[in-house]
């Protein structure tokens, strides 16, 4: 991976090229309305320390806000139709192995929260169901359910998938569509007024940016 960018400015500079950064690059270049130039700056080109390399790529539909449920509904649909989204017959099918998350309520207040959340999740298409203690015991007899009032469980589109392959294809497709990846580190961000306008690289260059996407992860000092 080259450490030096080919241009002095880009429409979008993405700091971090792992799952989030490469996803942003993929979706940008998939949008026909976007014709800009994209630079991805990655300091760990082997992704040895990236969170992407250490995740088990789990997904769930049980959230307390509609926007999170909708994001996860789309996430599951994307995994199920991965080959179509890649627009490439060489892309593999990605399996979503569902096992479901089980949330247990031991107070009337939290039981009501689970019921309200399940109703909202069902309305948005999730298969969440409220289980009684007897129903939970019948399915998972190893639980100590003393004091448990109910549980919330979704057996559909809650589990894990092959995130590593998705990441590889995000990056592959972004590069094929002209996204430039470099091995470097962003050490500073230039601000002018209320917006950012450039990044400074460890190698000394200052690169102009119309927009900056910070996907640098939890180890970043930005």
Residue ranges, per PLM feature:
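Gly/Ala-rich phosphate-binding loop of Rossmann-like dinucleotide-binding domains
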Residues: 25, 29-30, 173
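Dinucleotide-binding Rossmann-like beta1-alpha1 core, especially the glycine-rich loop
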Residues: 56-139
């Amino acid at each position: 991976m080259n450490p030096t960018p080919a241009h002095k400015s880009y429409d979008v500079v993405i700091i971090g090229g792992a799952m989030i950064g490469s996803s942003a690059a993929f979706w940008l270049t998939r949008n026909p309305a976007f014709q800009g130039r994209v630079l991805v700056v990655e300091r760990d080109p082997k992704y040895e320390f990236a969170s992407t390399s250490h995740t088990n790529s789990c997904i769930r539909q049980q959230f307390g806000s509609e926007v999170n449920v909708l994001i996860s509904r789309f996430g599951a649909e994307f995994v199920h139709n991965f080959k179509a989204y890649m627009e490439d017959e060489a892309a593999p099918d990605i399996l979503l192995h569902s096992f479901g998350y089980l949330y247990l309520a031991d107070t009337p207040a939290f039981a009501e929260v689970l019921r309200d959340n399940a109703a909202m999740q069902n309305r948005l298409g999730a298969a969440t169901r409220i289980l009684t203690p007897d129903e939970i015991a019948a399915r998972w007899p190893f639980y100590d359910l003393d004091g448990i009032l109910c549980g919330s469980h979704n057996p559909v589109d809650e589990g894990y998938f092959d995130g590593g392959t998705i990441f590889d294809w995000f990056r592959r497709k972004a590069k094929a569509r002209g996204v430039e990846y470099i091995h470097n580190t962003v050490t500073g961000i230039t601000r002018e007024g209320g917006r950012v306008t450039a990044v400074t690289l460890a190698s000394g260059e200052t690169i102009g940016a119309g927009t900056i996407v910070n996907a640098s992860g939890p180890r970043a000092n930005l």
